[in-house]
Amino acid sequence: MAVNTLDARGLKCPQPTLKITIMSTKMKAGDVLEVLADCATFEQDVRDWCARSKKVLLWIRPEGTAKRCQIQF
C-alpha cells in the first residue's frame, strides 16, 4: 500500500477534485491519497467524488484554514 500526497492549496474548486481524478489513474487498489486543500467547497466536493468513484474517504479534518483528507483506492 502506497501513500501519495497532493497539495491542492490555492486551487479554486473544482480544481482539487480534478487533480484527484488525474492522480487516481496512477493509484492501485489499496493505495491511499492524502489531499490538502483550502477551497470553500472541498469537503463536500471530496465526499461527492468518493461516492461517485466508489472510493473510501478514510477521514477528513481541518488543518488551519485548509482541510486534509485521506482517500483509499
Predicted regions and their residues:
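Domain-level signature for proteins that mediate thiol-based redox and metal-cofactor handling
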Residues: 1-73
